[in-house]
Amino acid sequence: MGMTSDSIANLLTRIRNALMAEHLYVDIEHSKMLEAIVRILKQHGFVAHFLVKEENRKRLMRVFLRYGEDRRPVIHALKRVSKPSRRVYVSAAKIPYVFGNMGIAVLSTPQGVLEGSVARAKNVGGELLCLVW
């Protein structure tokens, strides 16, 4: 399995590397799933903002990264949970609380891509895509 076959792992790695290099933004190939994940990151203050742009007939998503007062990334970790080789599904009751509730879980559910506390409130489980804190 090549890296590119897992676009979510690729997204997380690209963000992680860009943060370590102190980049202002990172460009990622667009998909509805990835946009939904990035939108949740934005809602929770983990990224500044994002925009979708066409370049050479390819849709790209430009994700603007966030750093704290001390110029350190506000994201401490991005962890892929479910993988193409080993899917991880959880019921609403088993959705993890991440890093003392400072972090978030992102799930793909029958009601779309949801943050853990939202899925828990709606009482829906799903595929546990990643954890961010």
Swiss-Prot record:
Belongs to the universal ribosomal protein uS8 family. One of its GO terms (biological process) is translation. It comes from Chlamydia trachomatis serovar A (strain ATCC VR-571B / DSM 19440 / HAR-13). The keyword Metal-binding does not apply. Keywords: Ribonucleoprotein, Ribosomal protein, RNA-binding, rRNA-binding. Part of the 30S ribosomal subunit. Contacts proteins S5 and S12. It comes from the Bacteria. Disulfide bonds: none annotated. This is Small ribosomal subunit protein uS8. One of its GO terms (cellular component) is ribosome. InterPro entries: Ribosomal_uS8 (IPR000630), Ribosomal_uS8_CS (IPR047863), Ribosomal_uS8_sf (IPR035987). One of the primary rRNA binding proteins, it binds directly to 16S rRNA central domain where it helps coordinate assembly of the platform of the 30S subunit. GO terms for molecular function: rRNA binding; structural constituent of ribosome.
